[in-house]
């Protein structure tokens, strides 16, 4: 990959990040407002949308999210 391709990929990632964040916020707000979100303990695997965003494991307890 040459320098121009890397710059274009970085610009695309930076430009798309607010949309990805908004999508995740909407997804998690729906999940935590759902009646079954009051389970004592459960684990959510979130797979990353981009190669430089590899994914995270969230442990959710009492509707609080800890990374």
From Swiss-Prot:
* Pfam families cross-referenced by the UniProt entry: YmgM
Q: What triggers or suppresses the expression of this protein? A: Expressed approximately equally in exponential and stationary phases (at protein level).
Annotated source species? Escherichia coli (strain K12)
Record protein name field: Protein YmgM
């Amino acid at each position: 990959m040459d320098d121009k391709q890397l710059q274009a990929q970085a610009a695309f990632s930076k430009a798309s990040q607010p949309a990805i964040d908004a999508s995740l916020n909407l997804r998690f707000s729906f999940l935590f407002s759902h009646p079954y979100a009051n389970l004592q303990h459960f684990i959510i695997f979130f797979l990353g949308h981009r190669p430089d965003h590899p994914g995270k494991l969230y442990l959710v307890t009492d509707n609080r999210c800890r990374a």
